[in-house]
């Protein structure tokens, strides 16, 4: 989990638009963020394995 202060800081409107960055909506992680799903790779994997993300399945071949 990211610090609460960092999560609040990311939500505030920035003075300059280039400073804005994405954070995971679940845990607040800033790295390995997937825009399409709005979450980081770790939360994405957990939710996909539980079947909480429609249309996403684990691949096997």
Swiss-Prot record:
Signal peptide: none annotated. One of its GO terms (cellular component) is small ribosomal subunit. HAMAP family: Ribosomal_uS14_2_B. Part of the 30S ribosomal subunit. Contacts proteins S3 and S10. Binds 16S rRNA, required for the assembly of 30S particles and may also be responsible for determining the conformation of the 16S rRNA at the A site. InterPro entries: Ribosomal_uS14, Ribosomal_uS14_bact, Ribosomal_uS14_CS, Ribosomal_uS14_sf. Zn(2+) binds at residues 24, 27, 40, 43. PANTHER family: 30S RIBOSOMAL PROTEIN S14, SMALL RIBOSOMAL SUBUNIT PROTEIN US14M. GO terms for molecular function: rRNA binding; structural constituent of ribosome; zinc ion binding. This is Small ribosomal subunit protein uS14. It comes from Roseiflexus castenholzii (strain DSM 13941 / HLO8). Keywords: Metal-binding, Ribonucleoprotein, Ribosomal protein, RNA-binding, rRNA-binding, Zinc. GO terms for biological process: translation. Binds 1 zinc ion per subunit. Its cofactor is Zn(2+). It comes from the Bacteria. Belongs to the universal ribosomal protein uS14 family. Zinc-binding uS14 subfamily.
């Amino acid at each position: 989990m990211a610090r609460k202060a960092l999560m609040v800081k990311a939500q505030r409107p920035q003075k300059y638009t280039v400073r804005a960055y994405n954070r995971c909506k679940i845990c607040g992680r800033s790295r390995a963020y997937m825009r399409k799903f709005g979450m980081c790779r770790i939360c994405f994997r957990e939710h996909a394995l539980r079947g909480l993300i429609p249309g996403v399945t684990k691949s096997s071949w």
